[in-house]
From Swiss-Prot:
The gene is atpF. Pfam families: ATP-synt_F (PF01990). One of its GO terms (biological process) is proton motive force-driven plasma membrane ATP synthesis. Component of the A-type ATP synthase that produces ATP from ADP in the presence of a proton gradient across the membrane. This is A-type ATP synthase subunit F. It is found in: Cell membrane. Keywords: ATP synthesis, Cell membrane, Hydrogen ion transport, Ion transport, Membrane, Transport.
Amino acid sequence: MKIAVVGDLDMTMGFRLAGLEDVYEVKNAEDALNTIRELDNRADIGLIITTERLGEEIRDSISNLKKFIVEIPDKNGAIVREHDPVKTLVRKAVGVELK
């Protein structure tokens, strides 16, 4: 399974330099949503990485997709939230609460 990256220029450039091939630069949330939907239908993609800010804008539209989508901070830093979505995923998958 491959990892795909969907994000802004700074994010995608970093992942390209790291050697990832399935890297897609998008200009806005609509482009990101369309790209992620296309990637969701590809059998060779197992994980999609995007930015927290894009994820926030398209969350309702991507919540029922098949692929595992990970949101990471962009160049502006992490979004402050009441709950950490990674902790929630770990708790659901493993049954252990991270502190």
